Amino acid sequence: MKKIAIFGSTGSIGSSLLKIIKDDQKNFKIELLTVNKNYKKLIKQVKLFNVKNVIVTDYNSFLITTKLLKNAKVKVFNNFDSLNKIFNTNNKIDYSMCAISGFDGLKPTLDIIKFTKTIAIANKESIICGWNLIKKDLKKYKTYFVPVDSEHFSIWSLLDNNKKNNFEKIYITASGGPFRNLSLKKFRNISVKDALKHPNWSMGKKITIDSATMMNKVFEIIEAKKIFNLNYKQLEILIHPKSYLHAIVKFNNGLSKLLVHDTNMTIPIFNSIYFNTDKKLKSKNIDIKTLNNLNLKKIDNIRFPVIKILNNLSNEDSLFETIIVSANDKLVKLFLNNKIKFNDISNTLIKICNTPEFNKFKSMKPRNIDEIQNLNDYVSLKISSMSV
């Protein structure tokens, strides 16, 4: 029986994983679930899966959860420092899913590595801002890493048993989001409602907006560069409106491999927990007959100007990537609250790339989590004071 921990159990990734586990409960024991505020959904999960440990990071929600579960023999904690009370390094759990969105996901990702045999990371911020810290701990504690993002899981699968220097180029695909065919003149009037209508994927609000600006692809390129130890010249984005082709690897022996699957995050999540097994997924597979027209084209950096940000990045890890992630996070929140216009997200991010105050961080490597978090807080305050 595999012992499991899920960080962000009430979000889309965590909920999808629990749905998978529900169909195979005899083979899994959930040791820990964590949430921020959604205690109502958490309590349902606790009862359904007989969970004995939970972490609720929002204090008011923690108090309510403690009260509601006082007779359920469930240990309720309020922060991730309590992981030391739940787990020990001499008896590692089998699998941890890190699916907390935003910067809040970095600390628990780093904290759980020493307690788990395998870690699946669905949190972009953790990889972009803290990969050198994560990589160091993965090696130190001999923890196996599996990427969950569909593009990176696809690359990871395609590169199986291949030497990392055995390929020329890796392509990741983008649907183009809801505005791939919208007149450029109409971009200034894009509403929050418009931007949340993704044509192919059902996702959370933050990542849906990132998909609309194409910032999610900027992040995915940065992630791929870090995870697979590449340089930016080896990576390229292609527009693929149907979203069933996720990655292409062009090898130096004249062959190229591609990976296709349905637009359903359950597939990479399922394979992250069942890799190296012959477990069958109870979900529809893609109809191969639909592959008659891949319809691939280069991305338009006039329509999606944030792609230009990649030109400002060094192949060396730096704190500048934290600035980009933090600024985007704050700008998306402002847009979702109708404080700024859609175009302001891209324009402000590009402006930041050309600001000397921030450019100095391009030569600075992140040394610890406090440095990353302090810079995140600083950038968030700076964006709030900027004239966007």
UniProtKB/Swiss-Prot annotation:
<dbReference type="InterPro" id="IPR036169">
    <property type="entry name" value="DXPR_C_sf"/>
</dbReference>
<dbReference type="Pfam" id="PF13288">
    <property type="entry name" value="DXPR_C"/>
</dbReference>
<feature type="binding site">
    <location>
        <position position="10"/>
    </location>
    <ligand>
        <name>NADPH</name>
    </ligand>
</feature>
<feature type="binding site">
    <location>
        <position position="13"/>
    </location>
    <ligand>
        <name>NADPH</name>
    </ligand>
</feature>
<dbReference type="InterPro" id="IPR036291">
    <property type="entry name" value="NAD(P)-bd_dom_sf"/>
</dbReference>
<feature type="binding site">
    <location>
        <position position="204"/>
    </location>
    <ligand>
        <name>NADPH</name>
    </ligand>
</feature>
<dbReference type="Pfam" id="PF08436">
    <property type="entry name" value="DXP_redisom_C"/>
</dbReference>
<keyword id="KW-0479">Metal-binding</keyword>
<feature type="binding site">
    <location>
        <position position="220"/>
    </location>
    <ligand>
        <name>1-deoxy-D-xylulose 5-phosphate</name>
    </ligand>
</feature>
<dbReference type="InterPro" id="IPR013512">
    <property type="entry name" value="DXP_reductoisomerase_N"/>
</dbReference>
<keyword id="KW-0414">Isoprene biosynthesis</keyword>
<comment type="similarity">
    <text>Belongs to the DXR family.</text>
</comment>
<dbReference type="Pfam" id="PF02670">
    <property type="entry name" value="DXP_reductoisom"/>
</dbReference>
<feature type="binding site">
    <location>
        <position position="151"/>
    </location>
    <ligand>
        <name>1-deoxy-D-xylulose 5-phosphate</name>
    </ligand>
</feature>
<dbReference type="InterPro" id="IPR026877">
    <property type="entry name" value="DXPR_C"/>
</dbReference>
<comment type="function">
    <text>Catalyzes the NADPH-dependent rearrangement and reduction of 1-deoxy-D-xylulose-5-phosphate (DXP) to 2-C-methyl-D-erythritol 4-phosphate (MEP).</text>
</comment>
<feature type="binding site">
    <location>
        <position position="149"/>
    </location>
    <ligand>
        <name>Mn(2+)</name>
    </ligand>
</feature>
<keyword id="KW-0560">Oxidoreductase</keyword>
<feature type="binding site">
    <location>
        <position position="220"/>
    </location>
    <ligand>
        <name>Mn(2+)</name>
    </ligand>
</feature>
<feature type="binding site">
    <location>
        <position position="124"/>
    </location>
    <ligand>
        <name>1-deoxy-D-xylulose 5-phosphate</name>
    </ligand>
</feature>
<dbReference type="GO" id="GO:0051484">
    <property type="term" value="P:isopentenyl diphosphate biosynthetic process, methylerythritol 4-phosphate pathway involved in terpenoid biosynthetic process"/>
</dbReference>
<feature type="binding site">
    <location>
        <position position="150"/>
    </location>
    <ligand>
        <name>1-deoxy-D-xylulose 5-phosphate</name>
    </ligand>
</feature>
<dbReference type="InterPro" id="IPR013644">
    <property type="entry name" value="DXP_reductoisomerase_C"/>
</dbReference>
<feature type="binding site">
    <location>
        <position position="217"/>
    </location>
    <ligand>
        <name>1-deoxy-D-xylulose 5-phosphate</name>
    </ligand>
</feature>
<feature type="binding site">
    <location>
        <position position="151"/>
    </location>
    <ligand>
        <name>Mn(2+)</name>
    </ligand>
</feature>
<feature type="binding site">
    <location>
        <position position="198"/>
    </location>
    <ligand>
        <name>1-deoxy-D-xylulose 5-phosphate</name>
    </ligand>
</feature>
<dbReference type="GO" id="GO:0070402">
    <property type="term" value="F:NADPH binding"/>
</dbReference>
<dbReference type="GO" id="GO:0030145">
    <property type="term" value="F:manganese ion binding"/>
</dbReference>
<feature type="binding site">
    <location>
        <position position="38"/>
    </location>
    <ligand>
        <name>NADPH</name>
    </ligand>
</feature>
<feature type="binding site">
    <location>
        <position position="11"/>
    </location>
    <ligand>
        <name>NADPH</name>
    </ligand>
</feature>
<feature type="binding site">
    <location>
        <position position="123"/>
    </location>
    <ligand>
        <name>NADPH</name>
    </ligand>
</feature>
<feature type="binding site">
    <location>
        <position position="175"/>
    </location>
    <ligand>
        <name>1-deoxy-D-xylulose 5-phosphate</name>
    </ligand>
</feature>
<feature type="binding site">
    <location>
        <position position="211"/>
    </location>
    <ligand>
        <name>1-deoxy-D-xylulose 5-phosphate</name>
    </ligand>
</feature>
<keyword id="KW-0464">Manganese</keyword>
<protein>
    <recommendedName>
        <fullName>1-deoxy-D-xylulose 5-phosphate reductoisomerase</fullName>
        <ecNumber>1.1.1.267</ecNumber>
    </recommendedName>
</protein>
<dbReference type="InterPro" id="IPR003821">
    <property type="entry name" value="DXP_reductoisomerase"/>
</dbReference>
<dbReference type="GO" id="GO:0030604">
    <property type="term" value="F:1-deoxy-D-xylulose-5-phosphate reductoisomerase activity"/>
</dbReference>
<feature type="binding site">
    <location>
        <position position="125"/>
    </location>
    <ligand>
        <name>NADPH</name>
    </ligand>
</feature>
<feature type="binding site">
    <location>
        <position position="37"/>
    </location>
    <ligand>
        <name>NADPH</name>
    </ligand>
</feature>
<feature type="binding site">
    <location>
        <position position="216"/>
    </location>
    <ligand>
        <name>1-deoxy-D-xylulose 5-phosphate</name>
    </ligand>
</feature>
<keyword id="KW-0521">NADP</keyword>
<comment type="pathway">
    <text>Isoprenoid biosynthesis; isopentenyl diphosphate biosynthesis via DXP pathway; isopentenyl diphosphate from 1-deoxy-D-xylulose 5-phosphate: step 1/6.</text>
</comment>
